[in-house]
Amino acid sequence: MTEATFSPDRRAMMGLAALGLAAAALPIGANAALANEPAGGAPPKTGLTPDQALARLQAGNSKFLGNNRPLADLSNARRLALAKGQAPYAALVGCADSRVSPEHLFGEGLGELFVVRTAGNYVDDAGLGSLAYSVAALGVPLIVVVGHERCGAVDAATKLVTGNKQLPPVLTRMVEPILPAVVDAQAHHASQGGDLLDHAIHYNVSHVVKQLRESRDPLFSEPLSEGKLKIVGAYYDLDTGKVEFFDRG
């Protein structure tokens, strides 16, 4: 969403919903306070490095592709353990599309992935705060922005830019954050050819990756500079089921 569509009151309400009342009440940049929040019997934070977390996602997608899909642990014991707290090893920004369920694509169950989903996999204030919480409070070492083949939101943004479609006001506002990626994709398409929509989907992912990497909030900038956090892009092929990672920095 653009700044104009987010009033301070609405931004605050969405931030509280995303982070929880206790976390949202902390001052911005309170890394230590978030990181040292009492666990209350919660599982320990992941010990994976960013590269190890990425390798686990890749391995999970390989199993998904090979029909060797491990059964997720949905037992009562697992549920009760997670009731005490969460310790995901990766955060994902994904599209709201019903065909793109991150847990299935990467063969994971409850409590393994911290997922933020919006149509078009962009990040607004609530999403940004949610991701910051996953890094600072939960110790996530990896954020992956996942776009996907034939994304309806990016397609709508592309048609809006090319003048081939008009959208209702609420949908126009929804795709506004995607429009700069479409403009960049148009320039690439003019010189390189190929499918404009596919280019726009990739550029949209790269724009969000850049947005997160260049955030001035210390909850992102500090772990990035220390090598404790990595932010990468990915593209999910609906036809093959394969997730291609790119823009790894």
Q: For each of these PLM feature ranges, what is it?
A:
Residues T2, P50, P102-L197, I201, ...:
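Short HxH-centered metal-ligating active-site micro-motif
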Residues T2-L21:
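N-terminal secretory signal peptides and thylakoid transit peptides that target proteins
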Residues I28-G66, P70-L74:
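C-terminal segment of N-terminal export signals and the immediately downstream linker at the start
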Residues L57, L92, V145, G233, ...:
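Divalent metal-coordination and catalytic microenvironments
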Residues G60, C95-D97, T118-A119, H148, ...:
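Fold-independent oxyanion-binding glycine-rich loops
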Residues P70-L128:
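Conserved beta-strand-loop surface patch within small alpha/beta domains used
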Residues H188-K230:
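Charged, glycine-interspersed solvent-exposed loop segments at helix/strand-loop junctions
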Residues P223-F245:
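GST superfamily/GST-like fold recognition
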